[in-house]
Amino acid sequence: MPKCDICGKGSIRGFQYSHSNRRTIRRWKPNIRKVRAIVDGTHVTLNVCAKCLKAGKVQRAL
């Protein structure tokens, strides 16, 4: 599972509880996009979460 290259956000594990309170392991996955960005004047493909994209932490290459 990819992680965000900016903030390091990745998937987390937890339990899903049924009505009878039985639990099974489930995963929460971040909204990660592959983005072409400009890093040190070169075009690089990064895995970036949607929160970092909205915050403007990545300068996208057009």
Swiss-Prot record:
Belongs to the bacterial ribosomal protein bL28 family. Keywords: Ribonucleoprotein, Ribosomal protein. GO terms for molecular function: structural constituent of ribosome. GO terms for biological process: translation. Pfam families: Ribosomal_L28 (PF00830). It comes from the Bacteria. Disulfide bonds: none annotated. NCBIfam families: L28 (TIGR00009). This is Large ribosomal subunit protein bL28. GO terms for cellular component: ribonucleoprotein complex; ribosome. The lineage of its organism: Bacteria, Bacillati, Bacillota, Clostridia, Thermoanaerobacterales. PANTHER family: 50S RIBOSOMAL PROTEIN L28, LARGE RIBOSOMAL SUBUNIT PROTEIN BL28A. It comes from Caldanaerobacter subterraneus subsp. tengcongensis (strain DSM 15242 / JCM 11007 / NBRC 100824 / MB4) (Thermoanaerobacter tengcongensis).
